[in-house]
Amino acid sequence: MSLIVSDRFRIVVGLGKSGMSLVRFLANRGVSFAVADTRENPPELATLRRDYPQVEVRCGELDVDFLCRADELYVSPGLALATPALQQAHARGVKLSGDIELFARYAKAPVIAITGSNAKSTVTTLVGEMAVAAGKRVAVGGNLGTPALDLLSDDVELYVMELSSFQLETTDQLNAEVATVLNISEDHMDRYSGLPAYHLAKHRIFRGARQVVVNRQDALSRPLIGEGLPCWTFGLNKPDFHGFGLLEENGEKYLAFQFENLMPVRELKVRGAHNQANALAALALGHAVGLPFDAMLASLREFTGLEHRCQWLREHDGVHYYNDSKATNVGAALAAIEGLGSDIDGKLVLIAGGDGKGADFSALRAPVAEHCRAAVLLGRDAELIAQALGDAVTLVRVDTVQAAVEQSARLAQRGDAVLLSPACASLDMFKNYEERGRVFAQAVECLS
């Protein structure tokens, strides 16, 4: 149903970045709506009151009777659908939806939809750069950068969207041209009842998809629906007939499609097996929408990675320092430890800790024992990580990132790498993972 011809009333619940994009979208289409937020002073409140003074806004505890005035609630991803007021409104017949559902209704160009526990932003950025290199008018965003509704334009030829599990919870039918779940590992266990619930939320991305891309080495990435859809695969093993992978020739590894070498792995500017997997996933997604190989490979050769994502900072006294502050869950830390650990001559000194979000850290023990010389732990859940690691490596506990860098520099030997890959969120000590990464980078720069 067109929003313009509908006389139904909506409420935007949550006034952050995506909530404000909903406000702009609805206001520009003449839709009748109001706004609610659980916070007394949400981030975009001043902007709303300045630009849309006529819009009713309620801040503080959600009022169920107020919510039930609406036919539909557009719930921001930061607010759990299990929130009692939302559940009560839903039980009384109010539809729960979100910005991605609206985006899907109005997007006219093909959509590449990307989710996963890790590497979403890197792969999304890579595919966007590949599309630009191929001469496409492309819009990139969603959970990364620009909110989805702000990207809508008749001029766009291709959308490349990073989507979180929270965004997908309120998305019934995305209708992507190609969709992928890059990988699945425990994350946000403070919001989900367990891995199965998180898994189901991620897999909503496949609803209505015309093609899928699957990680051959992660069974949880395979669609629960859509048997018979065109399927492309990627993995760090030999490619299958519909897949991208690694081949070896004369002792050199190549990114490959089917049985054809595409480019030597050594030509990638980003290091580690996890970055090879990211490159292969991006190739599969680009190929699914017809991007030419020459443009995609040129983009791969120039890609230097994203800030706070296994980002090389400097070399000091024969030790390399990497900022992987974006590793806010165990799966992301595992990818960095295994990917970088297998790519250097020495050992890693790992810096980890923060808000674990209810995660199980036991999966860290084996790769840390294999690839790390020591682990320097800090933050709220440092002791939980220490218990999981046991006697696998030398453990050092500190109170600040600066102290962690100083201790790591003492522990590391020439040929080693110091890796900040926390396996935790940052909110116990920092505003966000970006601030944590900047503090780490500053501490590394101060080493002398």
Curated annotation (Swiss-Prot):
Pfam families xrefs: Mur_ligase_C, Mur_ligase_M, MurD-like_N
One GO BP: cell division
Location of this chain's protein in the cell: Cytoplasm
InterPro entries in alphabetical order: Mur-like_cat_sf, Mur_ligase_C, Mur_ligase_C_dom_sf, Mur_ligase_cen, MurD
A single Gene Ontology CC term: cytoplasm
Entry annotated with the keyword Cell cycle: yes
Classification via Gene3D superfamilies: Mur ligase, C-terminal domain, Mur-like, catalytic domain, NAD(P)-binding Rossmann-like Domain
Xref: SUPFAM superfamilies: MurCD N-terminal domain, MurD-like peptide ligases, catalytic domain, MurD-like peptide ligases, peptide-binding domain
EC top class, as a word: ligase
Keyword annotations of the record: ATP-binding, Cell cycle, Cell division, Cell shape, Cell wall biogenesis/degradation, Cytoplasm, Ligase, Nucleotide-binding, Peptidoglycan synthesis
Binding site for ATP: G116, S117, N118, A119, K120, S121, T122
Pathway per the UniProt entry: Cell wall biogenesis; peptidoglycan biosynthesis
Stated role: Cell wall formation. Catalyzes the addition of glutamate to the nucleotide precursor UDP-N-acetylmuramoyl-L-alanine (UMA).
Family per similarity comment: Belongs to the MurCDEF family.
NCBIfam families membership: murD
Identification of the protein by name: UDP-N-acetylmuramoylalanine--D-glutamate ligase
Organism: Pseudomonas savastanoi pv. phaseolicola (strain 1448A / Race 6)
